[in-house]
């Protein structure tokens, strides 16, 4: 049933301070028909002027509510229609929720529906974060002519690497199960996060988290490698279909940041209009970190940027954004914004820091070092990886509820006390080192297992000893050559592998130390490898593996940072 209201926006959003505002028109719970007959439910908010206006579309799985939010109100007052829609299978929308496959067509159909309305001028933009950002990428794949610009926040553009698995093939078990439990659990069912992430086999962890079997989750479990299933749905694999201007926003401690930056780099050669902004944030940009503050300059007026962006592409008003460099990143350590023409910055150059020890790099008390000089000693380090006692995740780019699964920068010294964590550090720096770009660990490793994992974490060590995590990653050894074609290892054979440890922008200040942690688990950020060589998601039991890291003249294991000259 469609209802029409004429309300004073200032009364509907009493939390807003300031002068009296214009009245708006709102239609609540409007049915929007999809091509298969399923009806989605939308709220429509309009200016009172009887003219055709451009529209902002927000498609959400989190519930559109029964009224307008202060953020959406600002767009109506600025002359936009705002349409907020429950995606298929969520809240008041019909159908089954199939997030892997439904959003391209449903986004396309909703855009066409808006364009047909008497209040619409046919020009539409989309905005929102997380899943609400992902659906923007999906709608853009449709090539709908009415979609003129998108503004995805903390969303990424690849289902495999961002939402479910990772650049190294391990599953983001904590992220995925926590999101599912928050949003999809059966009514009245509850189990603690710390319990359901431990469930074995991983394939049936959906029941532990939700109280029911999720077809979506089971389908993901059937495709642990990057196969045709993922290629068919990945925006990353179809990025040439994205023809609209994109303003992407990410955070250095967000799960999607690497993908946000890669998307910009992929789009930029084809169009000079796209932009990317990355700050010192986690998945919720407005949530402060508990123990770390990056200063008042780290706060960005995102709504103002959105209004400028949509005024440019939906109303034809020239924006100051046009004359500014398209990349804006916050450099931690210096706590300053930096503008660039490209990502990665054109002036950044690889800096290799070689791992070395006397064979006792285990823990913070060990003898592991990082140096620009290649290792001279023929020593190696060993540790035992017991997946029943994994290295715990301590902050980082995790998602999506910090009360349950804490995110962001944290002191890593409790983790570095463990014997199954190898610690390599530089001497205190004699000058600042500005690292902006990808972080990689090139390692020469052997294992007693047919398959196992290796992790790498970049850490900024302060003069007082605080060890602040910057970024991290993992490699499932079977994917050492390719995510598409897994290959089991030969026990005790030495392999050269590259662990993709993400991206960062940080000045390691004079007197600080650069540190690299190497281990075989980071749980529950990533699932635990069973170390058997079998299907990890089906393993009912886990076994130990003995890991060896080589770093000598023949096996030059190293950390690779992209360093910007001028700070040294």
Regions found by a protein language model. Name each.
Residues 38-40, 47-56, 120, 241-242:
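Proline/glycine-enriched tight loop/beta-turn segments at coil->beta junctions
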Residues 47-116, 163-166, 171, 287-294, ...:
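Cap/lid segment of the alpha/beta-hydrolase catalytic domain
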Residues 118-131:
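Alpha/beta-hydrolase fold nucleophile elbow
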Residues 77, 138-241:
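Accessory cap/linker subdomain of secreted extracellular hydrolases
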Residues 242, 248-250:
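Short beta-strand/loop motif that positions the catalytic acidic residue
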Residues 258-274:
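Active-site-adjacent alpha-helix of alpha/beta-hydrolase-fold enzymes
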Residues 197-202, 277, 291-568:
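C-terminal, loop-rich substrate-recognition/catalytic regions characterized by aromatic stacking residues
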Residues 18-50, 425-431, 444:
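N-terminal cap/lid segment of alpha/beta-hydrolase-fold proteins
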């Amino acid at each position: 049933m469609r209802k029409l209201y004429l309300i004073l926006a200032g009364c509907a959003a009493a939390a807003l301070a300031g002068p009296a505002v214009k009245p708006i028109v709102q239609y609540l719970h409007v049915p929007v028909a999809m091509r298969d007959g399923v009806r989605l439910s939308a709220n429509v908010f309009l200016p009172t002027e009887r003219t055709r206006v451009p529209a902002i579309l927000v498609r959400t799985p989190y519930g559109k509510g029964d009224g307008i939010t202060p953020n959406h109100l600002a767009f109506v007052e600025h002359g936009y229609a705002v349409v907020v829609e429950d995606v298929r299978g969520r809240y008041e929308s019909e159908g089954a929720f199939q997030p892997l496959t439904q959003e391209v067509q449903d986004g396309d159909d909703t855009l066409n529906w808006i364009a047909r309305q008497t209040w619409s001028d046919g020009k539409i933009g989309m905005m929102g974060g997380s899943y609400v950002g992902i659906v923007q990428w999906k709608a853009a794949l449709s090539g709908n002519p009415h979609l003129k610009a998108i503004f995805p926040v903390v969303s990424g553009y690849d289902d495999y690497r961002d939402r479910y698995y990772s650049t190294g093939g391990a599953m983001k078990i904590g992220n995925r199960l926590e999101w599912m439990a928050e949003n999809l659990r059966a009514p009245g069912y509850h189990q603690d996060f710390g319990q359901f992430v431990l469930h074995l086999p991983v394939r049936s962890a959906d029941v532990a988290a939700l109280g029911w079997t999720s077809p979506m989750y089971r389908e993901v479990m059937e495709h642990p490698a990057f196969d045709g299933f993922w290629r068919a749905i990945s925006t990353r694999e179809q990025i040439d279909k994205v023809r609209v201007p994109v303003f992407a926003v990410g955070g250095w401690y967000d799960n999607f940041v690497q993908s946000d930056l890669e998307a910009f780099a992929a789009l930029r050669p084809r169009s000079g209009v796209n932009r990317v902004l990355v700050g010192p944030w986690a998945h919720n940009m407005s949530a402060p970190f508990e123990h770390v503050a990056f200063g008042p300059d780290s706060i960005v007026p995102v709504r103002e940027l959105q209004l400028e962006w949509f005024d440019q592409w939906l109303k034809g008003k020239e924006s100051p954004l046009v004359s500014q460099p398209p990349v804006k990143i916050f450099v931690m350590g210096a706590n300053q914004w930096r503008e660039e023409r490209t990502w990665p910055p054109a002036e950044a150059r690889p800096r290799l820091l070689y791992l070395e020890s006397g064979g006792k790099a285990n823990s913070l008390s060990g003898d592991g070092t990082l140096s620009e000089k290649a290792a001279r000693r023929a020593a190696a380090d060993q540790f035992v990886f017991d997946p029943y006692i994994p290295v715990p995740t301590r902050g980082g780019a995790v998602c999506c509820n910090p009360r349950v699964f804490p995110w962001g920068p944290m002191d890593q010294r409790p983790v570095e006390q463990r014997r199954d964590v190898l610690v390599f550090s530089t001497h205190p720096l004699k000058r600042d080192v500005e690292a902006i770009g990808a972080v990689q660990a090139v390692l020469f490793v052997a294992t007693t297992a047919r398959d196992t994992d290796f992790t790498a974490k970049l850490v900024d060590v302060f003069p007082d000893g605080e060890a602040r995590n910057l970024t991290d990653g993992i490699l499932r050894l079977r994917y050492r050559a390719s995510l598409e074609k897994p290959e089991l290892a030969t026990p005790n054979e030495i392999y050269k592998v590259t662990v993709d440890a993400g991206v960062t922008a940080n000045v390691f200040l004079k007197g600080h130390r650069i540190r690299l942690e190497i281990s075989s688990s980071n749980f529950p950020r990533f699932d635990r490898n069973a170390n058997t060589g079998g299907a990890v998601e089906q393993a009912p039991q886990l076994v130990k593996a003995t890991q060896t890291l080589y770093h000598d003249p023949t096996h030059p294991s190293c950390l690779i940072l992209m360093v910007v000259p001028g700070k040294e």
